[in-house]
Amino acid sequence: MSTKLILSFSLCLMVLSCSAQAAQLWPWRKGQDSRPHHGHQQFQQQCDIQRLTASEPSRRVRSEAGVTEIWDHNTPEFRCTGFVAVRYVIQPGGLLLPSYSNAPYITFVEQGRGVQGVVIPGCPETFQSDSEYPQSQRGQHSRESESQESSRGDQHQKIFRVREGDVIPSPAGVVQWTHNDGDQDLISVTLLDANSFHNQLDENVRSFFLAGQSQQGREERRSQQQTREEGGDRQSRESDDVEALIGANILSGFQDEILHELFRDVDRETISKLRGENDQRGFIVQAQDLKLRVPEDSEEGYERQRGDRKRDERGSGRSNGLEQAFCNLKFRQNVNRPSHADVFNPRAGRINTVNSNNLPILEFLQLSAQHVVLYKNAIIGPRWNLNAHSALYVTRGEGRVQVVGDEGKSVFDDNVQRGQILVVPQGFAVVVKAGRQGLEWVELKNNDNAITSPIAGRTSVLRAIPVEVLANSYDISTEEAYKLKNGRQEVEVFRPFQSRYEKEEEKERERFSIV
């Protein structure tokens, strides 16, 4: 009897141990956190939104090889949704230094191409380069370790190619860096979710850099202190937020002796540079001789499979599968490919969606994105988000947007253009009409499977309601209710209304094009 009890107790301990390892290796898991969602508690009184604004960045922080642009997230819509928006402009050859945040985020590449690195705690270094270093740069290693190092080359975690139209997610606390190896500026916009349950701090988003230093950041801190002394509450709060987003080199706070003891093979000068002393380059620096071997799309799957086989050959059969599940996650999905459109109307435009179905990591981050392309004068909506807030970032063209809130009043009715962000809270109905040059935008949302409900069209809510119910709801005849219900046969994206003259003109053009 005692033997059975001991065996049962041992099995329970083993299960608990494996569960703890899984939780430790995968801290971004989707879960219903037991603690109250601090964002909803603190911001619910700030969601009484009477007016929305389409805004551009309010702060610019210059670095040696680029600019960091920050939106004012103290406006009612930003505070309500918990969104924080940042745009990075990296010049050719520029390197956005390694950093992490206390909140998950999703990035959209608006322009250019580059290389992205992701560092996941506990995952192996499955990538290697052909770089060779002289012995003096390797430190005092044994001959055996030197021979192993020279045979392997430089090893590191995964890197991948990024280009225009890519959506790149990042969990809280995971280090990422970006290098522009193209011939034009690499521009990306990032949306951080301060209300995420992954953020264990307050409603502020913080950036933590592993290198560099920002002279402008020091100036912001001095300006912040002066603002506090002058009693400017809003300006002081905005300065606090900007300082947190600009971040600082976390190594600069450690003493030289501690760092020298940790990194024993480096000299005092290197320790000083680790701490960013006298470094005025900012957090986007000009990289020197940065040659990275990046697998192209067709190679990435092969490299991943080869890495799995190598680990199996080294005896990784003892693995419980956690490494394969977590370390091989995909961190990129392109939403700018017409052939992958989820909704397409040849006369109106298209919608591409990236969510947890085609990018599984988004399930754990509770984020997703849509890329919408509208042709000349085309219309989308009215529609609303059932389970998410959204931030619309305009990438091309111009158009008119109308948003209606819960009081049945318009909270936004204006034109939008490239570079602007419009935050739309959950449930607010939106209609967008493109201008003469068309309109393109990306919608970043705080749900991994955000659902929209259109009011018009073949998949609309009105289409799903019986004609008699519509007739009584709007006090109209059943004939008019039928027309209302079935007037549009398109799905979500609608071609513009055409007069009889315009229709005849279009038919004439089609006839000549066929001839």
Curated annotation (Swiss-Prot):
Outcome of swapping residue 374 to R: Significantly decreased IgE-binding to the wild-type epitope 347-R--N-387
Domain of life: Eukaryota
Region (Disordered): 123-156, 210-241, 295-320
Post-translational modification: Proteolytically processed from a single precursor to produce an acidic and a basic chain that are linked by a disulfide bond.
Keyword check for Cell membrane: no
SMART domains associated with the record: Cupin_1 (SM00835)
Site (Critical for IgE-binding): 163
Residue stretches spanning the membrane: none
Family: Belongs to the 11S seed storage protein (globulins) family.
PANTHER family: 11S GLOBULIN SUBUNIT BETA-LIKE, OS03G0336100 PROTEIN-RELATED
Designated name of the protein: 13S globulin seed storage protein
Organism: Fagopyrum tataricum
Lineage, highest ranks first: Eukaryota, Viridiplantae, Streptophyta, Embryophyta, Tracheophyta
